[in-house]
Regions:
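Generic, well-ordered alpha-helical scaffold segments in large soluble proteins
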Residues: 162, 166, 182-186, 228, ...
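Short mixed-charge
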Residues: 96-101, 195-216, 379-408, 520-530, ...
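Phosphate/ATP-binding catalytic cores across multiple sugar-kinase/actin-like superfamilies
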Residues: 228-231, 334-355, 368, 373-377, ...
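PRPP-dependent phosphoribosyltransferase catalytic core
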Residues: 226, 241-243, 248, 260, ...
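Extended, hydrophobic alpha-helical segments in both membrane/secreted and soluble proteins
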Residues: 359, 366-373, 411, 421, ...
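Conserved short alpha-helical segments that host acidic/polar catalytic motifs at enzyme active sites
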Residues: 1-289, 295-358, 362-363
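Terminal amphipathic helices with adjacent charged low-complexity linkers/tails
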Residues: 300-315, 361-398
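Active-site proximal loops enriched in glycine and acidic residues that flank catalytic Cys/His/Asp
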Residues: 237, 248-249, 269-271, 298, ...
């Protein structure tokens, strides 16, 4: 119920025809710009702290700019950057505005390659200087680079040490700056390699420049750059000479999809936005595979290249549960299955009392799982009806039949979010009091003192909104019991691959487990896990073990959930409260192709993830006890 931030969305477009083609067919040479806007707006869910775009012209004379960028901060950043681009054209006559040759020759952003980025910060760093794309400029066109990405690296310190060891001096200690310098350095080396080949061919002047731009191999650049990256990433780039690329991590943690026809090549973080923007069937859209790069040459020739050996695929399951748009055909089915998988545990919790239970959902992102839950409950109730009717024999009483057939799953819109109030109370001392009114409730939607209330959510991470708002406001309806149902398992571990949840103390599941250890006189387990974690410092990250698992090991999921209820239920709550979680196996059955579950299981796909959780636990203990 609390909003999770996740690192970013990307969009990349390469026009495969001259600008005149789009002016003639679509009535505007700005076809690429317009499609980029649509791709970014349709992925607005992936980033609301800032946005940026970059463009490269393939044809520009020396002395003319060919690489352009716009960036802005805030939730309205997409609109702002495109308005700023359009401001370059406001004084043009209608004839000039529809003259593709004139635009190509004289106007900024009248190019053939485009790249867009939506930002959510998961590192705590903010400001316009951290908004992608980043630029690295040079007098050689081929050495210019625009870079953006959806990523988090766990080994920034190692990469920083590596590039400073060869004499580079990054201006900031931030992962994107460091990666820009690293990829830029490898791009420089590749240009110099091809330069030497051109000289060996006897070429001079512009002949060398043209040779470089025709023979540069971005696969070499990416292979030598990315071999030491540890993290989840989709990195996109444009070079000044007109090449485009996107590379995905070997574990497939972060998502990317692409499409090509005779007019355009496009890549985005989410599949349905490509379907919507270009009106193409899902079958025509391809997934960029783990460790693979999409490479587009200056001439517009597209190819994929296996840059890094693919590892066991660990695609982020939170993308399916919460982050990605639910309009994707597979995500929609998976979220419905997540709701359906919860049905046995829900029935057990309510003691099969469907006649006195009302079902609803909070927030809207849980709506699809809610439909799946209802479908599963309907199936169960129909089976029960069949058995009851069969028990009546060959000559059933009509009244008895009517009673059986009249039974329905009771679903209601119990809570409605007040968007304006949510914005208003973002800060201030009275936040907690006002937070209780973020949701309005539908009075009369259940029978007070008689009915149970089941509310499904997509995830419970910190539990803040539950404690400050949800439980208290639902209790006003007078339910006998409140069941908070999560379509995802207990979030127990930090994420280091792009989700804004990096501190152990944030997780209500972790806090509950620690409280149980204290209550049961098992604090030695905390000390032991700390000591083992501390002893690992200095080991190669590949040898490290996630000892935080020992904090949870003594307890069942149900014991931890029960303690969470104690911690989250506000004083004065009249209804009994229970939390029901999705079992881990239920998640895997619902999303079989998205096995990345480290925030639930502690099984990190990369060594860097284990190193980071180790340090997070050490930090938690040392801050708590002021070591």
């Amino acid at each position: 119920m609390e909003q999770l931030k996740h690192e970013c969305g990307v969009a990349m477009i390469r026009l495969l025809k001259p600008l005149e083609y789009y002016e003639k067919k679509y009535g505007t040479w700005m076809y690429g710009l317009n499609k980029l806007y649509l791709l970014m707006e349709k992925q607005h869910n992936r980033g609301q702290e800032g946005a940026g775009l970059a463009c490269v012209k393939l044809e520009a004379n020396p002395g003319e700019e060919y690489m352009f960028r716009e960036r802005a901060l805030g939730s309205g950043a997409i609109t702002e950057i495109f308005e700023n681009v359009q401001n370059n054209f406001k004084d043009l006559t209608s004839e000039q505005l529809h003259d593709a040759e004139f635009a190509k020759r004289t106007l900024p952003f009248a190019g053939e390659t485009y790249m867009g980025h939506l930002r959510y910060s998961t590192t705590g760093k903010s400001g316009i200087s951290y908004v992608h794309p980043f630029l690295r400029r040079n007098n050689w066109r081929a050495k210019n680079l625009a870079l953006c990405g959806n990523f988090n690296m766990t080994n920034v310190d190692e990469i920083f040490a590596r590039i400073t060891a060869i004499g580079q001096h990054p201006r900031k200690y931030a992962d994107t700056y460091i990666m820009l310098e690293q990829v830029g350095h490898r791009l420089d080396r590749e240009v110099e390699r091809v330069f030497n080949l051109a000289e060996a061919e006897g070429l001079t002047g512009m002949g060398i420049t043209n040779y470089i731009e025709e023979h540069i191999d971005l696969a070499n650049v990416l292979r030598t750059s990315s071999r030491e990256w540890d993290g989840g990433y989709v990195i996109c780039g444009l070079t000044g000479s007109g090449e485009s690329f996107a590379i995905r991590d070997p574990w497939g943690i972060r998502p990317a999809f692409w499409y090509q026809d005779e007019e355009i090549a496009v890549l985005a973080s989410e599949r349905p936005v490509i379907q919507t923007a270009f009106n193409v069937p899902v079958e025509d859209i391809k997934e960029l595979q783990p460790g693979q790069a999409l490479l587009i040459s200056k001439e517009g020739k597209l190819r994929t290249s296996q840059i890094n050996k693919p590892r066991e695929k660990q695609a982020c399951s939170f993308e399916r549960i919460y982050f990605s748009r639910g309009s994707d055909v597979d995500i929609y089915k998976e979220r419905k299955r997540l709701g359906e998988k919860l049905v046995p545990n829900i029935l057990k919790a309510i003691n099969n009392d469907l006649d006195h239970t009302v079902f609803s959902f909070i927030p809207n992102t849980a709506e699809v799982a809610f439909y799946g839950m209802l479908q599963g409950l309907d199936d169960y109730l129909n089976e029960e009806k069949v058995q009851q009717i069969a028990a009546l024999g060959h000559n059933p009483n009509m009244e008895e039949l009517e009673v059986i057939l009249s039974r329905r799953i009771r679903s209601e819109k119990v809570a409605i979010k007040d968007i304006k109030l949510r914005t208003f109370i973002a800060e201030g001392n009275s936040r907690n009091d006002l937070a209780a009114h973020v949701y309005d409730i539908t009075y009369g939607s259940l029978v007070s003192g008689v009915d149970n209330l089941v509310i499904i959510d997509d995830s419970i991470v910190r539990g803040t909104t539950l404690k400050q708002s949800i439980i208290g406001i639902l209790d006003r309806l007078g339910p006998k019991k409140i069941f908070i149902v999560s379509s995802s398992p207990q979030v127990r571990y930090p994420d280091y691959y792009g989700i804004d949840m990096a501190k152990m103390s944030e997780f209500i599941a972790f806090r509950a487990a620690v409280e149980l250890l204290k209550e049961r006189d098992m604090k030695d387990i905390i000390a032991s896990a700390y000591r083992k974690s501390k002893d690992q410092i200095g080991l190669p990250k590949e040898q490290m073990v996630n000892y935080v698992k020992e904090i949870y090991a003594p307890f069942t999921d149900e014991e931890i959930s029960a303690k969470m209820v104690e911690l989250l239920t506000p004083k004065g709550t009249k209804a009994k409260v229970e939390i029901v979680y999705q079992p881990l196996e239920g998640l895997h059955e619902a999303c079989p192709n998205y096995r990345g579950d480290w925030y639930f299981s502690g099984n990190y796909p990369t060594p860097g993830g284990v190193k980071m959780v180790n340090q997070a636990f050490i930090n938690y203990i040392e801050q708590l006890y002021q070591f």
